[in-house]
Regions:
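C-terminal helical "lid" subdomain and adjoining coupling/linker elements of P-loop NTPases
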Residues: 1-6, 10-29, 125-133
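Soluble catalytic regions of large protease machineries
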Residues: 25-32, 38-235
Length: 235
């Protein structure tokens, strides 16, 4: 069983980097970062189930990771699910800011993925009330048949481009605000999970269930992310 789990970890997060030794400050940042991801995932009813949290460096750049597994096959994603996914992606960065009043470069991939997701919600899926049921998709067009592609000229105005950027920012800002509220409300659980990670380095599902129960933040208290009206959240 241990060999199977190690093989799965290699597939999900890459090879363990035993020569990548973090200093104490880095370990604390990574522990709170991953604890933030895991805790917010536990508190969002549409988020995938957390199966493991680790602060063991793996792969090319990962200093830690939160492993999630869907409970069922999915062929489409609802808006509520995408909003919860935004929350989980931003939770590591928000945890750093909340605890240390500082942030690190560790959230780079999270921020890129969150930005891409928010932009797709606005430009591909018609999930912006401000812009309506319109897609703004500049798909690359082949230069020659089966040849390299070139971006198509933008088919919308500069004003629309600014509106798209504004909606993307709004979605991200609102997600940040929701996550900040969740982590502040459950600060004790965040601290306990980070401490457990610093002690054990890996927290599995059983350990997480025990911690959530002991800190009065059971998984059944999960709440869905609720979108704020346009213009009410963030800057």
């Amino acid at each position: 069983m241990q060999d199977f789990e190690e093989a799965l970890d290699r597939i999900v997060a890459g090879l363990e980097k035993k020569n990548r030794v973090m200093n104490p400050t880095e370990r604390k940042f990574v522990a709170y970062h991953e604890a933030g991801h895991a805790l917010v995932a536990e508190m969002r009813k549409n988020a995938d189930r957390v199966t493991k949290v680790s602060i063991i460096p793996r792969g090319i750049a990962a200093l830690g990771y939160t492993q999630q597994s869907p409970t069922e096959d999915r062929y489409l994603m609802r808006r509520s699910e995408l909003l919860d996914r935004l929350d989980v992606l931003l939770a590591g960065r928000v945890a750093e800011q909340l605890v240390f009043e500082d942030v690190s470069t560790g959230a780079e991939n999270d921020l890129q993925r969150a930005t891409d997701l928010a932009r797709h919600m606005v430009t591909h899926y018609g999930m912006s009330e401000a812009l309506g049921l319109v897609t703004y998709d500049a798909r690359p067009a082949p230069l020659f048949l089966n040849g390299p592609t070139l971006p198509e000229p933008r088919t919308f105005s500069e004003r629309t481009a600014e509106a798209i950027d504004g909606e993307v920012r709004r979605l991200l800002d609102e997600a940040r605000d929701r996550v900040t509220q969740t982590l502040r409300t459950n600060r004790g659980t965040l601290e306990a999970l980070a401490a457990l990670l610093l002690e054990k380095e890996v927290v599995d599902r059983t350990m997480l269930d025990g911690l959530m129960a002991a800190t009065a933040a059971p998984a059944q208290l999960r709440v869905a992310a609720v979108a704020l009206p346009p213009g009410d959240g963030g800057s």
